């Protein structure tokens, strides 16, 4: 699926399969797909100066590694002492830089709608300064990032689609605009 493809792109770019920067060398459970071996990365003239692979499912392990890699020059943000959403957003914000390459796998899993809006602002600003993002998301908030190319995975095909054509947008809009009718229909059948 989408997360497998994102992971393969991350590994092909040299990121740790569990997440982090290209400098992260750890493995708690090696389960990544061999798809990365079949991907050939074609790079353009610009080289990213920084990058990060952030995935909700292995965030705890990455936060632990962040603490282990901390030193005097790069103190720990003490992610385990914060709420899940606060630590996830802080880690993302601490690692976003212009001209970077970022791969985010379902970041909304850890974030409230308000924190998703905060992340949207950060992503938008970094993208305007040359950063490139690949984000797998079901969040209609994050799908709404201005000027984003949205790819939909439907019936075995991958294609560009408009924001309003995404299932996440359509289902959310339907629920918000017809909540009671939808609940009545779903819960009485």
Region roles according to the model:
Residues 4, 28-30, 34, 75-76, ...:
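Catalytic phosphate/metal-binding cores of nucleic-acid and nucleotide-processing enzymes, i.e., regions
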Residues 23-83, 163-185:
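Conserved nucleotide-sensing/catalytic segment adjacent to the nucleotide-binding pocket
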């Amino acid at each position: 699926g989408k997360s497998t493809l994102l992971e393969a792109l991350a590994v092909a770019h040299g990121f740790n399969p569990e997440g982090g920067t290209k400098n992260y060398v750890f493995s708690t459970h090696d389960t990544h797909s061999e798809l990365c071996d079949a991907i050939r990365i074609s790079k353009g003239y610009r080289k990213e100066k920084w990058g990060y692979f952030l995935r909700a499912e292995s965030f705890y392990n990455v936060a632990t590694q962040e603490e282990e890699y901390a030193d005097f020059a790069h103190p720990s943000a003490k992610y385990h002492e914060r709420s899940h959403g606060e630590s996830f957003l802080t880690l993302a914000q601490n690692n976003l830089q212009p001209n970077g390459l970022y791969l985010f796998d379902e970041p909304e899993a850890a974030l409230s709608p308000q924190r998703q809006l905060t992340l949207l602002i950060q992503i938008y600003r970094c993208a305007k300064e040359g950063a490139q993002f690949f984000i797998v998301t079901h969040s209609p908030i994050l799908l709404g990032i201005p000027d984003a190319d949205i790819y939909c995975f439907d019936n075995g095909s991958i294609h560009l689609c408009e924001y309003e054509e995404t299932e996440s947008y359509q289902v959310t809009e339907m629920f918000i605009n017809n909540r009671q009718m939808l609940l009545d229909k779903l819960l009485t059948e």
